[in-house]
């Protein structure tokens, strides 16, 4: 069955306060060959208030051995034929495997929740003022919380549920990691670009949530997204169509370029 995850013993522990979130385990994805991105990103992460962060070596798509090892861990799933870019741009595979690497850490160690950031993050200038308010108003039952994202729907709310792209700033719970792991690896057509797989899971959940026979009825995949568009700022405006990625309170820095694909 597609979009399926087996029943498991959940860990229903969530950050209760914004301070809890800032003190939560935080992993920052960074390639070994990009130390300058880490140096810059680390300063931003410290300034944002995160105190329990740790750099994680990203799976380098330019290293075939790392790719092979990563796919072996996942059982060498087939690639979806329709996503030509997933094969054409191995950086997409590296991104996929890097996030699975962190989800595996969460699952193996039964970590209740973890902040996952990519090294090109930029925080909204009013992050310290806005983020605590957003967090206080976020329901504490999520599998995934998007601190930043690319909205694929018109939101009229500060905190919403809807399909989004991007993986640069997320909070993933143990329950979320378990669900994402299985939902993404059980696709009959194969795996493809990671945020495309996640957004398809979101759309499926929204379409089937009222179906009495749906898995999502009894054990839903639950996520929330922070909509920062109520607080415009010039720093979110970037070339190469990157501005659309910056709809939350955490943005992606276009000046670093992309290790995922050419732009």
Where are these regions (language model features)?
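An acidic/histidine-cluster motif and surrounding catalytic segment
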Residues: 1-117, 121-263
């Amino acid at each position: 069955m597609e979009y399926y995850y087996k029943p498991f013993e959940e860990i229903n522990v969530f950050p209760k306060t914004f301070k809890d979130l800032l003190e939560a385990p935080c992993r920052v994805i960074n390639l070994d060959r990009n130390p300058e991105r880490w140096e810059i990103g680390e300063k931003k992460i410290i300034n944002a208030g995160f105190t329990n962060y740790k750099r994680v070596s990203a799976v380098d798509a330019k290293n075939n051995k790392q790719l092979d090892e990563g796919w072996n861990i996942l059982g060498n799933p087939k690639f979806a034929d329709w996503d030509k870019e997933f094969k054409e741009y191995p950086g997409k595979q590296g991104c996929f495997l890097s996030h699975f690497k962190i989800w595996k850490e969460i699952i193996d160690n039964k970590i209740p929740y973890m902040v996952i950031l990519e090294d090109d993050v930029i925080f909204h200038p009013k992050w310290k003022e806005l983020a605590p308010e957003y967090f206080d108003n976020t329901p504490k039952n999520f599998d995934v919380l998007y601190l930043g994202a690319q909205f694929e729907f018109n939101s009229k709310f500060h905190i919403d549920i809807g399909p989004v792209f991007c993986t640069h700033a997320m909070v993933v719970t143990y329950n979320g990691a378990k669900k994402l792991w299985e939902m993404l690896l059980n696709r009959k057509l194969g795996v493809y670009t990671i945020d495309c797989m996640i957004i398809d899971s979101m759309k499926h959940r929204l379409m089937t949530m009222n179906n009495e026979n749906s898995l999502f009825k009894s054990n839903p995949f639950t996520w929330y997204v922070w909509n920062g568009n109520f607080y415009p700022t010039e720093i979110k405006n970037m070339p190469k169509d990157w501005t659309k990625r910056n709809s939350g309170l955490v943005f992606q820095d276009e000046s670093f370029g992309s290790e995922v694909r050419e732009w």
